[in-house]
């Protein structure tokens, strides 16, 4: 027999969980104005406002409908992510303010970034994501090529920094990206599974969206490294400037020179890719800065 979801109302928002949960701790932080309850990570996130200041709250400890794992694992992953947000602090990453345990769960509090998620599957599930003029992804794809390249530059700059810090990006996809259409700023909002190198694939199929994943992210005992992240960056370039998994030049909206850089990055043969995100980004910038966009 299927469990009947429990409806929860907090201030301006309503959502469902597998069972009742106490959110008194959250209400003390301010007025809840947004909820993000469709993630399969086990996390439940909120927008909270107090005295005109907005914060983004990420919480593990409640039985969300989409999560298939154990609550202990969700809490542990969220706790472990704290050091990532501290060590990888960057202008293009949401800013962690504080973190603490509550009841049987754990909370991370970030500064609120006023952006829209490029993979808002809860509001615009495909094909709406690609066709609805109100979809953040649709709006992003209708920005100028230059604006999209600047957004990609923020993403590549951050991952060059991640690489220098001896980390590897895991589970990076368009759902990790927030874009502010008023200021044209880009922020990364989810690095919870990024890991220190060396990192070996012990799962077979790693976490992530197949649209952005390299062959080695499906291969048991494969090394996940800088060349893997080069593939991820190239795949993101095709998602935001081209035809996504259709990596033909026909659907590419920027220059042939930039296309060739992105196409080399997503070579299935890892040896033929750029050796690092840094070398990929330098080649990309050399072309973009020469106005060969």
Language-model features: locations:
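Conserved HxN/HPN-centered segment at the entrance to the catalytic loop
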Residues: 88-99
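Juxta-kinase regulatory segment immediately upstream of eukaryotic protein kinase catalytic domains
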Residues: 1-34
């Amino acid at each position: 027999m299927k469990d009947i979801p429990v409806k929860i109302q907090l201030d301006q928002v309503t959502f469902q969980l597998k069972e009742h949960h106490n959110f008194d701790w959250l209400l003390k932080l301010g007025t809840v104005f947004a909820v993000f309850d469709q993630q399969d990570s086990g996390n439940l996130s909120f927008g909270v406002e107090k005295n005109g200041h907005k914060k983004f709250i990420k919480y593990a400890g409640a039985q969300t409908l989409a999560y298939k794992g154990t609550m202990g694992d969700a809490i542990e992953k969220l706790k472990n992510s704290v050091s990532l947000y501290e060590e990888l602090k960057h202008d293009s990453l949401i800013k962690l303010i504080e973190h603490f345990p509550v009841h049987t769960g754990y909370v991370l509090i970030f500064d609120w970034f006023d952006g829209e998620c490029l993979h808002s599957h809860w509001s615009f599930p495909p094909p709406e994501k690609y066709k609805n003029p109100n979809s953040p992804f649709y709006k992003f794809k209708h920005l100028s090529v230059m604006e999209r390249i600047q957004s990609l530059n923020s993403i590549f700059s951050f991952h060059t920094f991640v690489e220098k810090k001896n980390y590897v990006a895991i589970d990076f996809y368009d759902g990790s990206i927030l874009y502010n259409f008023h200021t044209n700023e880009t922020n990364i909002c989810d690095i919870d599974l990024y890991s220190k190198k060396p990192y070996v694939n012990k799962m077979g199929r790693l976490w992530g969206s197949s649209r952005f994943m390299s062959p080695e992210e499906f291969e048991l005992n494969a090394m996940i490294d800088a060349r893997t992240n080069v593939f991820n960056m190239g795949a993101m370039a095709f998602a935001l400037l081209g035809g996504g998994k259709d990596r033909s030049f026909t659907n590419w909206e920027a220059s042939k020179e930039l296309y060739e850089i992105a196409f080399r990055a997503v070579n299935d043969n890892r040896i033929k890719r750029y050796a690092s995100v840094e070398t990929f980004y330098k080649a990309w910038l050399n072309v973009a800065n020469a106005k060969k966009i």
